[in-house]
């Protein structure tokens, strides 16, 4: 059985996907993993996609190429207050603390039917308008993704498009393997980024 | 059966003898349930193609406000609440009866405890004549992600099936239904393009939540259980986890098998397609979708496919009724119980001459099954279609 994590998409340059497997750099209970290793990315991008992975945690990243300048993509990605503009699985979102522009602001998202989740409370961790970096962490909600934290970066590609890198780290829930957890989250993230590409091109 | 009835009706008439064979008694007991408003609409529905008999439409409005969901507590406060039916956007319930000599149907579709109504029901009696025989179409669609794929199935699938059946060589029902479902799936997938060009249809725009969000939602789908009933046969096509059950001489015969990702043959199919089933709050395709087949859900193709499984069943004199329902019913009510309830309602009405009574009986059955599902804490939308399959005593009509 082929695991979608090792996605054949990974080597399929035509659809712009690369799903990266974590690379161990140190031994011990906490591993530092750089998810953009082997890619040509700006230094700050590499830094943002480097995670310290504890025991019973896992991390991965999805890369999406978009044929539009980073500014156009950023206009959608920066909307911590309105992730619905490109995330199909979100039914509703409201800011419950702050205005969605400052670190520490909280949003509560309701998830569409048919998914193994109902709601999620998320905290804005990074919003770097200059370098096009956004990060949020999950602080509550009715789902199985504990201690989830994601970082999304945009940088210009050689052909005047945008490279979107979204990486995440999350606890492996009891009853599931690391591989299953990555498979599930990658499916969601990949779907979001594909939708981001379509939404950007429609603008 | 009386026990079930008592369970639903609760403590209204603890000492009253339960006459499960009397339709009048059943109707009276249904009427006692609080928060139900029966609106008899005298408006005559447009005549059906081949059926110009008197038609009457009956709408039952069921309140499903959270506070009203516990039927027992409703019953206790019945005197205060009775007849003060409340309608809100979250509680639109419709039970329709088509009064004519063919066929006799009852349907109920309620939002229940869910925030959104994503079920859709499609009833098209005499949707097709073939070899001078009347064919009837019944469908239940349970949407996920949003309502628009289920809505689209409700609007279109009977037309697609009709066109396919009209060019069907002999009785190639399986092939015809598979083709129809695939066409339906294509229409749903291509809908985005139509939208951009023509704009959405009004009904869609009004009813579809995600329309504003993104015209191209890959992550929306629907189950489809469809039955075409001819004078001789019952053809059931199923894709997803809604279900059709035949009640024959008191025995519940499932005419479809749910498409769950952990069904052994479905699991193998998914794995052979390169997908995987992950137990993530139940068995799910890639950990996401809890069914292995559906209309729509482009993002999970080719693991999740729109191809239905088709059964063709010869009708017999012992057939009593056909129940189509979404998993909002089947998750909490076993096939046998559902058949028992429907049978009791139909028996109360008796077969044959009194067409109105038989229609009411089908509506009663659909409503009672829905109430039972809500009483058993169904957390989903609940949609039920009950079709009377008993042959007339006087043999006036064969379906």
From Swiss-Prot, chain A:
CDD domains: PYR_PYL_RCAR_like (cd07821). GO terms for molecular function: abscisic acid binding; protein phosphatase inhibitor activity; signaling receptor activity. Keywords: Abscisic acid signaling pathway, Cell membrane, Cytoplasm, Membrane, Nucleus, Protein phosphatase inhibitor, Receptor. SUPFAM superfamilies: Bet v1-like (SSF55961). Transmembrane segments: none annotated. Residues 1-29 are annotated as: Disordered. A motif (Gate loop) lies at residues 113-117. GO terms for biological process: abscisic acid-activated signaling pathway. It is found in: Cytoplasm; Nucleus; Cell membrane. GO terms for cellular component: cytoplasm; nucleus; plasma membrane. InterPro entries: Plant_def-hormone_signal, Polyketide_cyclase/dehydratase, START-like_dom_sf. A motif (Latch loop) lies at residues 143-145. The record marks 116, 177 as: Involved in interactions with PP2Cs. Abscisate binds at residues 87, 117-122, 144-150, 166. Monomer. Homodimer. Binds ABA on one subunit only. Binds to CARs protein in an ABA-independent manner, both at the plasma membrane and in the nucleus. Binds both (-)-ABA and (+)-ABA. Interacts with HAB1, ABI1 and ABI2, and possibly with other PP2Cs. PANTHER family: ABSCISIC ACID RECEPTOR PYL5, OS08G0374000 PROTEIN-RELATED. Upon interaction with ABA, the 'latch' and 'gate' loops change in conformation leading to a tight dimerization and the creation a surface that enables the receptor to dock into and inhibit the PP2C active site. Belongs to the PYR/PYL/RCAR abscisic acid intracellular receptor family. Receptor for abscisic acid (ABA) required for ABA-mediated responses such as stomatal closure and germination inhibition. Inhibits the activity of group-A protein phosphatases type 2C (PP2Cs) in an ABA-independent manner but more efficiently when activated by ABA. Confers enhanced sensitivity to ABA. Can be activated by both (-)-ABA and (+)-ABA. This is Abscisic acid receptor PYL5.
Curated annotation (Swiss-Prot), chain B:
It catalyses: O-phospho-L-seryl-[protein] + H2O = L-seryl-[protein] + phosphate; O-phospho-L-threonyl-[protein] + H2O = L-threonyl-[protein] + phosphate. It holds the Pfam family PP2C. Induction: Repressed by MYB44. Induced by cold stress, drought, high salt, and ABA. GO terms for biological process: abscisic acid-activated signaling pathway; defense response to virus; negative regulation of abscisic acid-activated signaling pathway; negative regulation of anion channel activity; regulation of stomatal movement; response to abscisic acid; response to cold; response to water deprivation. Keywords: Abscisic acid signaling pathway, Hydrolase, Magnesium, Manganese, Metal-binding, Protein phosphatase, Ubl conjugation, Zinc. Ubiquitinated by RGLG1 and RGLG5 in response to abscisic acid (ABA). Ubiquitination of PP2CA leads to its degradation by the proteasome. Residues 104-389 form the PPM-type phosphatase domain. Zn(2+) binds at residues 146, 148, 208, 210. It is an enzyme of class 3 (hydrolase). PANTHER family: PROTEIN PHOSPHATASE (PTHR47992). Interacts with AKT2/AKT3. Interacts with ABA-bounded PYR1, PYL1, PYL2, PYL3, PYL4, PYL9 and PYL12, and with free PYL2, PYL3, PYL4 and PYL13. Binds to and inactivates SLAC1 and SRK2E. The inactivation of SRK2E does not require phosphatase activity. Interacts with CBL1, CBL2, CBL3, CBL5, and CBL7, but not CBL4, CBL6, and CBL9. Interacts with RGLG1 and RGLG5. Interacts with KIN10. This is Protein phosphatase 2C 37. The gene is PP2CA.
